A protein has these predicted regions:
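Short histidine/acidic/glycine/proline-rich micro-motifs that form metal-
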Residues: 124-129, 154-156
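Conserved GNAT acetyl-CoA-binding A-motif
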Residues: 113-127
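C-terminal "cap" of GNAT-fold acetyltransferases
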Residues: 143-181
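A short, internal acetyl-CoA/4′-phosphopantetheine-binding micro-motif in the GNAT/acyltransferase core
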Residues: 89-97, 125-126
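Conserved active-site alpha-helix within GNAT-family acetyltransferase domains
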Residues: 103, 127-149
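Short amphipathic alpha-helix that is part of the acyltransferase structural core
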Residues: 4-44
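Acetyl-CoA-dependent GNAT
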Residues: 25-26, 33-88, 93, 173
Length: 181
């Protein structure tokens, strides 16, 4: 399965060229490693990352440099709300952090899915995750969208040491403009 490049895929981050593309199953081990090494995400099984790259490639994005994947955003379209896509995980390898790569991936994914008619983005964020809070807040602001925050899963829904999950709902996303002829 060939990886599908995304529009304007090249960006330099700290002197390193980074390309954005849809994931392929072979990316699974690298995504699992990036998630594990983040020390912030709930790490899923290695199998689930390979499966995600196969089944949800159209709603996910991978950043890669010459050494391979260095970041990712995984997501899916909500089955009971087809106009909404849910961002499952966002992670960037330590060597590429602090350069806006997570936000770049989110912007590209938002544009791609907005172009397919998805008007809302959702994600859950724990209260202690200030980086994700800042990223989703700036995404909403920069795209002229409303951002609502509501409790989704409290401590009664999660294992003992897990913080509650707050639902961030962003939208409606702007309809991408088509190039003039």
């Amino acid at each position: 399965m060939a990886a599908q490049p995304l529009e304007s895929p090249v960006r330099r981050t700290g002197g390193t060229e980074v390309r954005l593309r849809e994931p392929v199953p072979e990316d699974g081990p690298a995504l699992w490693r990036i998630a594990r090494d983040s020390r912030a995400l709930d790490v899923n099984s290695p199998y689930s990352y390979a499966l995600w790259c196969r089944d949800f490639a159209a709603t996910s994005v991978v950043a890669e440099d010459d050494d391979g994947p260095c970041g990712f955003v995984t997501g899916y379209v909500r089955p009971d709300a087809p106009g909404t896509f849910f961002v499952w995980q966002v992670a960037v390898d330590h060597a590429h952090r602090g350069r806006g790569l997570a936000r770049l991936m989110l912007d590209r994914l938002g544009a791609r899915l907005g172009g397919r008619g998805h008007r809302f983005l959702e994600a859950t964020v724990t209260p202690g995750n200030t980086a994700s809070t800042a990223m989703f807040t700036s995404f909403a602001r920069d795209h002229g969208c409303k951002l609502s925050r509501t409790p989704l899963f409290g401590v009664e829904h999660l294992p003992e040491d897990h913080e509650p999950e707050v639902l961030f709902r962003i939208g409606p996303l702007p309809v991408p403009r088509r190039a003039s002829r």
